Regions:
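NAD(P)-dependent short-chain dehydrogenase/reductase
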Residues: 244-318, 322-408, 422, 431-439, ...
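Residue-level signal for the nucleotide or nucleotide-sugar donor/cofactor binding architecture
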Residues: 211, 389, 426, 511
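Hydrophobic structural elements of the Rossmann-like NAD(P)H-binding subdomain
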Residues: 233, 340-341, 418
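Secondary-structure transition/capping motifs at alpha-helix termini
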Residues: 112-114, 222-231, 331-336, 404-410, ...
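Mid/C-terminal beta-alpha module of Rossmann-like enzyme folds, strongest
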Residues: 401-500, 509, 518, 522, ...
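N-terminal Rossmann/SDR dinucleotide-binding element
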Residues: 2-200, 205-209, 216-217, 225-231, ...
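Amphipathic terminal alpha-helices
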Residues: 4-5, 10-13, 45-58, 65, ...
Length: 564
């Protein structure tokens, strides 16, 4: 990518106009006090560089029970939240509508509510191109099969009456909209859903800053001009919480907070590692200019990794998403803010299409590589929990939370962890056992000797195991140079994959979901049936063996044949 093709830094001025002061020690609003945790400490090497000693992971006995510290299980409610009545005639403006969650959210709103219109921001050259993209990526999507069956011959007419494409770009000033479109939305919109983001973990730092920090800021500034706005909804990620361990509660991030802090008694504090968003923007801009004669993309990816590690996040994506939350909370003034933090989002569990998914996400490259026999080992603690949530559960929780908080009360911030570990835990050894069962029953045509996944806690041990297997394979296949080259590339890819997702294999935090459970308790019986948010009902064996991987193969791996 040339310098001219790189991210424009003109929008960075938007953030620098408000210099956020975070030099003083910030109050701890993120965690309750916990005297049972060893919180870690900062030490210094012989050359003066600080390094972080991770805190001890709490023992299982120290954690709440399966539903500990959560609201009681839901009881029947005749009144409910009032989801249908809230959305009746309401107009929604959504960014990221062609993404996995955005598309699922749109489908559910069209199928289950009687809302007014959905304005969908579409990156396109003109109105005609926007309509074409909306038709191709949303109306013709396999995800809309139930809606298509429901409306029959009037399906296209119905969707076109509800979905209004808006030409724009969240990475441009004023979101790239023309004045007429902007005025129409400002007059009519009730709820804004900000779902657009870059989900590439280690993308260019400048790009991640622009789309995950500046873009939400631009949208919030636009939101303040909307006359009837009732709620601003921001789709974030549970991993904005950084390298913290133990139980993580649904609290908003505060400006300048880093990913290291645990509680008020920690030696690690935001005063020692203050995160200044303006400084980070300027640093990325300078790096972009300085590296124009070199490999700009490589340099800016490296910079993102370095900054994330320094401030206590696993990667630049998580760090910039955290910064996005901070800037929204700091600049919203009297705009009510709802933040949804899903964990690892994967395919639909139930409706409208079990197994439907878009894109090769998180665990999916691991699953497919394993199914081909190219990834027999992984970096993870087999006894630790992983946290996965089907995308339909995220969409339903978002809709229910919007209805609950969209009725004007006061301009507050509400945070929801959309996660499963607290109420329906899944260990790594269980997940990989289910994946093994699937490929044993339905092997890929190109699969090679599927064995049970081996898990390592050291990268060096994993690398040696992979290379030893390749050496054995080369010995059997002979001296064919092409085969040796292919095997070498496979090992390199496997190592890269394991290293990229190493953080998830040893992640020792658990996302508290008290707000989601309280939401479930408030829902009526009918609402619970229509908007499934109860994660205790997920059967992980069924999900992996019969739903998710089948969907992955159909929708992502281009319909790979099953060799049963």
């Amino acid at each position: 990518m040339s310098l001219k093709q790189s991210v424009s830094f003109s929008p960075l001025v938007e953030l620098t106009t408000t210099k956020f002061s975070n030099k003083s020690k910030l109050p701890n609003l993120f965690f309750g006090k916990s005297k049972s945790r060893n919180s870690g400490k900062i030490s210094f090497s012989h050359n003066g560089y600080p390094y972080f000693t991770a805190p001890r992971h709490p023992l299982e006995s120290e954690l709440p029970t399966k539903c500990g510290e959560l609201p009681p299980m839901p009881t029947e409610s005749d009144v409910g939240i009032g989801i249908d009545s809230f959305f009746e005639g309401k107009n929604i403006f959504i960014t990221g509508g062609t993404g996995l969650l955005g598309k699922t959210l749109i489908e559910k709103l069209l199928r289950s509510t009687s809302l007014g219109k959905i304005f969908v921001l579409v990156k396109a050259g003109d109105k005609e191109a926007a309509v074409e993209r909306l038709t191709k990526e949303i109306m013709n999507s396999d995800l809309f099969v139930c809606l298509r069956e429901k409306h029959g011959s009037t399906y296209e007419e119905y969707v076109k009456s509800k979905l209004i494409p808006i030409v724009g770009n969240i990475c441009e000033p004023n979101i790239g909209m023309d004045i007429n479109s902007a005025n129409k939305i400002m007059e009519e919109v009730d709820v804004i859903v900000e779902s657009a983001a870059s989900t590439t973990l280690n993308d260019r730092y400048d790009f991640l800053l622009d789309i995950n920090v500046n873009a939400p800021l631009r949208l919030m500034r636009f939101a303040k001009k909307c006359k009837n706005l009732k709620l601003f909804v921001h789709i974030s990620t549970a991993y904005v919480n950084g390298i913290r361990e133990g139980i993580i509660y649904e609290k908003p991030l505060i400006m300048g907070e880093n990913g290291r802090k645990h509680d008020d008694n920690d030696e690690i504090s935001s005063s020692l590692f203050p995160l200044d968003l303006t400084d980070e923007m300027n640093l990325a801009m300078k790096a972009c200019i300085a590296s124009k004669e070199h490999d700009t993309t490589k340099e800016l990816k490296r910079l993102g990794l370095e900054r994330a590690a320094y401030y206590g996040w696993y990667n630049a994506y998580h760090m910039t998403k955290a910064m996005g939350e901070m800037v929204l909370n700091e600049t919203r003034q009297d705009v009510p803010l709802l933040i949804l933090r899903p964990s690892v989002v994967e395919s639909c569990y139930k409706a409208p299409v079990p197994g439907w998914i878009q894109g090769n996400r998180m665990y999916d490259p691991v699953i497919i590589s394993y199914g081909k026999g190219q990834l027999p080992a992984y970096l993870a603690d087999p006894d630790l929990h992983t946290d996965i949530v089907p995308v339909d559960y995220v969409a339903n929780t978002t809709i229910a939370a919007i209805a609950k908080h969209g009725i004007p009360r006061k301009a507050e911030v509400n945070v929801y962890h959309v996660a499963t570990d607290f109420v329906n835990p899944l260990r790594f050894n269980e997940m990989f056992e289910y994946i093994y069962e699937h490929f044993r029953a339905y092997p890929l045509v190109e699969s090679e000797n599927i064995v049970k996944m081996r898990m390592f806690d050291q990268f060096s041990d994993l690398s040696k195991y992979l290379r030893d297997r390749v050496s054995e394979r080369n010995a059997v296949l002979g001296e064919d140079a092409k085969v040796r080259k292919q095997n070498k590339a496979r090992v390199a890819y496997a190592e890269q994959l394991c290293k990229m997702y190493e953080f998830i294999g040893f992640f020792k935090a658990r996302f508290h979901t008290g707000n989601t459970r309280a939401l479930l308790e408030e829902m009526s019986e009918e609402e619970r049936e229509v908007y499934e948010v109860d994660a205790t009902k997920i059967d992980w064996n069924k999900y992996f063996v019969d739903i998710h991987i089948h969907g992955l193969r159909k929708h992502v791996v281009n319909g790979t044949r099953l060799s049963v």
